[in-house]
Amino acid sequence: CGAITIEEYRVVKEINMLDKVKKNKYGFYELKNKPIAEEQALNFEEEYYQNEEGGHENNYPTEALEYFENKAVQREYIIRKILGEDRKLRILDIGCGEGFLLQHFLNKGAEVCGIDYSKYGIEHNNPQLLPFLMQGDCYKILEKLIENNEVFDVVNTDCTLDMVPNPELLLQLIKRVVKKDGLIACKVSNNYSDFQIELLKNGTLSKEFWLDEKGHPSYFNKDGFVNFFDANGYECKGVYSERLIELNLMNELTNYYEKPETGKACWKTAFKIENMLHDLSMEDTVNIMRLFANMGLGRELLGIFSVK
């Protein structure tokens, strides 16, 4: 038998390494065998925060707290550029986590409301927000809000769309609780990006470290993210990168997936870099993050959408 070429080897390797996910018609990946919704909800409530999974902690370092506030300031800036500076905002945050974004907008005079499977994140970071939290299944809570004719200027959802069992249904429900001239701000993990695929192909990464069969059914990349919203009746107003930590993976000394002992230092450095950029110029940082997103880079992607 003749030896296969490097390109043929890469194709075979890519097929083998993507055996648990499939690319859908929108262009992003999803699990071939998705978790049962009830089991996923139990995982969120009992493990996700308590075991500090997914980057959530009980006590964040100073640079992380500064980063969260800076990102909230940037998000408000993006939203205000579209909706106007003087508009009184009513905000719904689906998957509100520890409540840092809610607290920012509450401090700015907005009316806020949060939805989350678990109260643990808010309880241990912003307990003053517990009266604004609706705990439980986001589908059921949204249906109740629809029944009560509740509408919002902004519906925010961070790292939720890629974790729910039926993202199409979530977008359809959101469409019914956002005002016609309102916005949807949605952040997802950026997975199976061209950058990640290349690192897998060239051996920099030995496996798909971001694959989470228990709690993460959908894996968005930039194009698939935008296509998915477009197909569900939304217009994209802009996409922005967040968390540029993945660039560390190109250095064997800071490849935090292969060398997890470097992870905390890499995260701390990433926070410091983005905080420094924000301090130099918040507006320029927003523009930089938009350019990074255009190239599909960034550990997370923030999309701003309106209803068509």
Name every feature range the model reports, one short phrase each.
Residues 4, 223-241:
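A SAM-dependent methyltransferase catalytic signature shared across enzymes that methylate proteins
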Residues 186-218, 223-228:
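Short, glycine-/aromatic-enriched active-site segment of Class I SAM-dependent methyltransferases
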Residues 168-183:
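A short glycine-rich, Lys/Arg-flanked "PGG" loop and its adjoining helix->strand segment in the class I
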Residues 45-48, 194-204, 253-256:
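Short, flexible, mixed-charge acidic loops at enzyme active sites
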Residues 237-269:
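Conserved catalytic loop of SAM-dependent methyltransferase domains
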